[in-house]
Amino acid sequence: MSFAIARVGKLNSWGKVGAAGGHNLRTRPTPNADPARSDQNVVLHGPDDLTAAVRDRLDAAGVKPGRKDAVLAAEFVLTASPEFFTDKTPEQVRAWANSQTEFLAQRYGANFVQAVLHLDESTPHVHAAVVPITPDGRLAMKDYIGGRENLRRLQTDYAKAMNVHGLQRGVEHSVAEHKTIREFYGETQAARRQPTPSVNIKPKVSQAPSWLMTANAVNEHTKAQVQRYADAKNEAIKP
């Protein structure tokens, strides 16, 4: 069983927006990425410059941050259990990636300002940014995306959208905690440094590459996390 995985973080300063943009475009050092494969990453949506994209959206909506620590953008990391990608062709990975941008565009419209597909780490994933402008013109992360109910609804709707790829949502109302993006990266960083063969999704290929098969350390590490996550949920819903 493979899970759809979505994490949401807060970018509450222009410095953090710039840092996220640098991470996405690999203009800053990224310890868990393979520099030899960074040219395989793809900007799926929006401009390369994340800071400019956020500023342009705020200007277009006529919104100015009211507080010094206002959340300027929500940062998404969208991925799936590592074993989901094991037998996928480059075309199938790109189809999955396109599903991420379709979901975000339908849900957040013009507030969805950037998405980047990373293929230089052990497991493909998409980083995306959404400016949290409410329908009544406020910059309000909690009302727009945050809060327990909003995040629960996001997880449910995202998993439904990913059902087409055979991905499932975890059990709702469980004791399993939502992990922040930093926690998610921290738990898998050591395993993600395991070298993996290169894959390029752009050219046509005649057969599926086995580019994740040597990343056994990564797969086993994350499978164990997913299993613990599922066990905790199942325990929580026992009568």
Regions found by a protein language model. Name each.
Residues 1-239:
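N-terminal nicking endonuclease/strand-transfer module with a His-rich metal-binding environment
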